[in-house]
């Protein structure tokens, strides 16, 4: 059973650190030996999430990983991999006011109750998006595992403030470059331009915007998952909902399925070139908690960032009197662009774990046990 700070059973990721502590990091266990990896590769992944730029927090973190164990001469050893990212640009003085005056939308009050007032409140502590850097670093290792199976994951900003990208995700480096070269991680140039104007307007008004990130995983084999509680959609939902500010997730057509008829909602299988495919993908590649061989498609909704300059009413926890707070510190006007690489990373972590678990439980020789390979007719 995964703990509150970890994901996975075979490929297991545990994260640690706080926003304004010495740093954040991840312990990754269950990594096969012999995978080629170095700090430069992980740093390139971290660069995709790093703050800065006109549409993100001005906090300037170098985000350079240190591999402290589990890698020798550029290859994984099979031992646990400890990844550490130092915090450099910390300004804890911004947050003293919020120790007893919880910010609306932040975890300040609930953390005060949960940890009896002993929580690290600087920058949100363990509730800060800063810890997602550790997930991205661990996700870089997970992607090396996925590459062995030919599985690739992409995540991009689907919408900001109601402006929606109209793109067909593709399994190509060209599609990845289109995501990464856009400052909002939106591969639709026209939609991105409209999104930028909205973000700039919200920032001028001292406000923030909500966003949706879509993730797509290609070449995932059918039959992956361990339902009911270990279904692929259940595990992915748990993982992405642990990302700060995530508030909803839907797979395939998601909530739109509630407004369809059964005759139009379900994906019909057919045989093409000796393999089973589906005519549509309204289920998002997952049925009954198991993958069906189609691309996994899901979307994550992120609320508008809670820290905004506009004054808002709160309560002083010492006197229980009314108080007012405004967003100090350095914060993002919209979360989606920096969350997209995080969604991609946790998706890779979940799928790497499931693939390695399947390999451990179902070695290649079990294919001989399928009914038709034994000449059994099937059916009752």
Swiss-Prot record:
It catalyses: 5-O-(1-carboxyvinyl)-3-phosphoshikimate = chorismate + phosphate. InterPro entries: Chorismate_synth, Chorismate_synth_AroC_sf, Chorismate_synthase_CS. Pfam families: Chorismate_synt. The keyword Chaperone does not apply. It comes from the Archaea. Its cofactor is FMNH2. It is an enzyme of class 4 (lyase). Reduced FMN (FMNH(2)). Belongs to the chorismate synthase family. This is Chorismate synthase. It comes from Aeropyrum pernix (strain ATCC 700893 / DSM 11879 / JCM 9820 / NBRC 100138 / K1). The lineage of its organism: Archaea, Thermoproteota, Thermoprotei, Desulfurococcales, Desulfurococcaceae. The gene is aroC.
């Amino acid at each position: 059973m995964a703990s509150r700070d970890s994901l996975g059973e075979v490929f297991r990721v545990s994260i640690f650190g706080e926003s304004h502590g010495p740093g954040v990091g991840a312990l990754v266990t269950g990594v096969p030996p012999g995978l080629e990896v170095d700090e430069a590769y992980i740093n390139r992944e971290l660069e995709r999430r790093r703050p800065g730029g006109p549409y993100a927090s001005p906090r300037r973190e170098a985000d350079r990983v240190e591999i402290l164990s589990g890698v020798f001469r550029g290859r994984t050893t099979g031992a646990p991999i400890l990844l550490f990212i130092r915090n450099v640009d910390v300004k804890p003085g911004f947050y003293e006011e919020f120790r007893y005056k919880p910010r609306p939308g932040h975890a300040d009050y609930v953390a005060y109750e949960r940890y009896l007032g002993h929580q690290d409140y600087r920058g949100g502590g363990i509730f800060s998006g800063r810890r997602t850097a550790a997930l991205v670093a661990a996700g870089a290792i997970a992607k090396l595992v996925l590459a062995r199976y030919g599985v690739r994951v992409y995540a991009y900003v689907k919408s900001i403030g109601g402006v929606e990208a109209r793109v067909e995700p593709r399994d190509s480096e060209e599609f990845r470059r289109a995501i990464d070269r856009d400052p909002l991680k939106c591969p639709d140039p026209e939609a991105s331009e409209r999104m930028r104007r909205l973000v700039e307007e919200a920032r001028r008004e001292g406000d923030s915007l909500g966003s949706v990130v879509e993730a797509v995983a290609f070449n995932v084999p059918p039959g992956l998952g361990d339902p009911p509680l270990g279904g692929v959609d259940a595990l992915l939902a748990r993982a992405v909902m642990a990302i700060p500010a995530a508030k909803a997730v839907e797979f395939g057509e998601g909530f739109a399925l509630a407004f369809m008829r059964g005759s139009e909602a379900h994906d019909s299988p057919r045989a093409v070139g000796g393999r089973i495919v589906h005519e549509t993908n309204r289920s998002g590649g997952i049925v009954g908690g198991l993958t069906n061989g189609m691309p996994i498609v899901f979307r994550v909704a992120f609320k508008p960032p809670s820290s905004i300059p506009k004054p808002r009413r709160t309560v002083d926890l010492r006197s229980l009197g009314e108080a007012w707070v405004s967003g100090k510190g350095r914060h993002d006007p919209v979360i989606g662009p920096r969350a997209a690489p995080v969604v991609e990373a946790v998706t890779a972590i979940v799928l790497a774990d499931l693939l390695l678990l399947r390999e451990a439980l179902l070695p290649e020789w079990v294919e001989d046990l399928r009914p038709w390979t034994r000449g059994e007719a099937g059916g009752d």
